[in-house]
Amino acid sequence: MTIMRKTHPLLKIVNHSFIDLPTPSNISSWWNFGSLLGICLMVQIITGLFLAMHYTSDTSTAFSSVTHICRDVNYGWLIRYIHANGASMFFICLFIHVGRGIYYGSYVLNETWNIGIILLLTTMATAFVGYVLPWGQMSFWGATVITNLLSAIPYIGTTLVEWIWGGFSVDKATLTRFFAFHFILPFIITALVLVHLLFLHETGSNNPSGLNSNSDKIPFHPYYTIKDLLGVLLLLMVLMILVLFFPDVLGDPDNYTPANPLNAPAHXXXXXXXLFAYXILRSIPXKLGXVXXLLLSILILXXXPXLNTSXXXGMTXRPXTQIIYWIFIANLLVLTWIGGQPVEXPFTTIGQIASILYFTIIIILMPIASMIENDILKLHT
């Protein structure tokens, strides 16, 4: 008799994805972040659902409904802080996941990579509309500043912004629709995740050596299930330390003041997750150029397969590109720091230099380094 998991129509899918999946025998802990992102998504959907049971998306009651959740609902404070800090953990895992993809050349799996970029953009959109919901000062002004960027689009900009707002400013209609978007987007993300996995399992996973691993595969279960479980436990431990000891360390104190359209906070800072893109946005004086650069900062990832000039797949055995890669990571951290600083010298200058460096590394330095390495390889063969 054959095993049920291999014959049952539903269990067969699970079996081919998580149990009998042939996996490279040498993938490192950097490959754990895919499963961690799945856990983050599940945690966010569950906590979000419970928050939505008590939240009201009306300008007059939104702020007090969040207060009510924290004060009166059983473990409401816990659910809220898991949701808020879970989002930060989600983005940390996302950036590590993308960084690993760039380092080990996973972008050669085109469909998987492109869906990953769409996932990144969708997650950023979800985080943005979610940040508006508590209706604090930062929520309101963040929404105003970011939606206003669309007014830079020639001819239709202003009309487009007013259409998104549902009026002439961020108001009741905006909050209600943002809540609707925030509710639906995670399910769209879940669907995209399944497509992401579908395309990944067509080709199989990449591995640290960058070589074809078809001759050396092991079953996903028990080897990687137990490895992923360790990752999940570590993730949940870090998340719970954040939630229970430092719940507000990644938040903004301004968001504890109810939204007031009449006075703006000293400086509106975007959510911690998208700060590097925000700094690139602020580095360009013209509004349209800034919006274009903001989009490009993420969309440039789509060009990574095309910009790949190397003969070898990953960066494991490419020291010159490795150095440039780590400069790139340091530069990203600088951009993230600048994004949280006020718009004054020397921060603006540092931001502009870091922004130029961001694009220069991806478009010029990395391909050149790869070509030089190819030439060195030819010399030694």
UniProtKB/Swiss-Prot annotation:
The keyword Transmembrane helix applies. Heme b b562 binds at residues 83, 182. Its cofactor is heme b. It comes from the Eukaryota. GO terms for biological process: mitochondrial electron transport, ubiquinol to cytochrome c. Binds 2 heme b groups non-covalently. PROSITE patterns: CYTB_CTER (PS51003), CYTB_NTER (PS51002). GO terms for molecular function: metal ion binding; ubiquinol-cytochrome-c reductase activity. The keyword S-adenosyl-L-methionine does not apply. Keywords: Electron transport, Heme, Iron, Membrane, Metal-binding, Mitochondrion, Mitochondrion inner membrane, Respiratory chain, Transmembrane, Transmembrane helix, Transport, Ubiquinone. A ubiquinone binds at residue 201. Heme 1 (or BL or b562) is low-potential and absorbs at about 562 nm, and heme 2 (or BH or b566) is high-potential and absorbs at about 566 nm. The cytochrome bc1 complex contains 11 subunits: 3 respiratory subunits (MT-CYB, CYC1 and UQCRFS1), 2 core proteins (UQCRC1 and UQCRC2) and 6 low-molecular weight proteins (UQCRH/QCR6, UQCRB/QCR7, UQCRQ/QCR8, UQCR10/QCR9, UQCR11/QCR10 and a cleavage product of UQCRFS1). This cytochrome bc1 complex then forms a dimer. This is Cytochrome b. It comes from Hylaeamys megacephalus. The lineage of its organism: Eukaryota, Metazoa, Chordata, Craniata, Vertebrata. The gene is MT-CYB.
